[in-house]
Amino acid sequence: MTHAFDMALPATLTHAQATAVAQQLQKTLLSAKETCVLDASALQQFDSSALAVLLGACRTAAQQKLRLQIIGLPKRAMQLAMLYGVSEILAGHSSLPPSP
């Protein structure tokens, strides 16, 4: 039986919200069993702190041997990830293809 823990990012995820969101995601991931789905579709206002939160979630999932799927990641967030050179990491967890 697969246990999916659905999580959602807020509409705004900047430096001001990053610590609280990261702590909540980590808490949820640490209590998960197999698969976690992270819905990023509400994300509208964000900065590089959002990438740090997402990368932290990917790292925690890997450490816990969980499958993390990021859905609804806005195109602008993936473009920012490409700018910082981390798009391949996020693409491995999202429904978006990796950069060419």
List each model region and its residues.
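STAS-like cytosolic regulatory interaction modules
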Residues: 1-46, 56-100
